Amino acid sequence: MGHKIHPNGLRLGITQEHRSRWYASSKTYPTLLQEDDRIRGFIQKKYASAGISDVLIARKADQLEVELKTARPGVIVGRQGSGIEELRSGIQKTIGDRSRQVRINVVEIERVDADAHLLAEYIAQQLEKRVAFRRTIRMAVQRAQRAGVLGLKIQVGGRLNGAEIARSEWTREGRVPLHTLRAEIDYANKTANTTYGVLGIKVWVFKGEVLSKEDQPLPVGASPRRKGSRRPQQFEDRSNDGK
């Protein structure tokens, strides 16, 4: 079953968190769900070059909180936070409510090459540039291994290299335990529009096992912070706190 079901859906509440965090009645639930879908579609289309991995949405009373996980936060934030205001007005226009309070948090992804969404996006871009799919997969695997992932699986399907008959090919490096629920599996799928047709891309990344507090070993000592290493950037919007 672990090889057929969606890895993220199987692990919701265990190692994966919900992308939308809010409660609603049966009457307003469909409307809010459609709003979330429109917001994600607007952000992915407007900031296609920002390397956005995920968009998390939370609702509290009349306030809407949007958290963006991106590899290039500067593209979204802009100069002196001007991009945040533009994004806020765009979200309000998308949902059709200019008076809605929108709070935006931009979080930088610390390990870009260990993110399944960004790896799938990289593979799609290379395939659309007519790079051979085997070379593209090999380069993606090397980038993920340098990022320190424990396992990786990549599958590409379609008219590979312009072949007359569509087929699927995949490769795996390291461990990818899809049946282990405590395994932190990052999964993403992407489509590449080539001159020969559409290619489907699936990426599984194994980042380790999430242990409970009872199973975790006792810390012996904190490792010193390396010189020159910087913390991941995080921009938190507090413009609506006083309203």
Curated annotation (Swiss-Prot):
Pfam families, A to Z: KH_2, Ribosomal_S3_C
GO CC annotation, single: cytosolic small ribosomal subunit
GO term, biological process aspect, one: translation
Regions of compositional bias (Basic and acidic residues) in chain numbering: 233-243
Residue span of region Disordered: 215-243
Location of the KH type-2 domain: 39-110
A molecular-function term among this protein's GO annotations: structural constituent of ribosome
Keyword field: Ribonucleoprotein, Ribosomal protein, RNA-binding, rRNA-binding
Family, similarity comment: Belongs to the universal ribosomal protein uS3 family.
Known partners and oligomeric status: Part of the 30S ribosomal subunit. Forms a tight complex with proteins S10 and S14.
Function: Binds the lower part of the 30S subunit head. Binds mRNA in the 70S ribosome, positioning it for translation.
Protein name per its UniProtKB record: Small ribosomal subunit protein uS3
Gene: rpsC
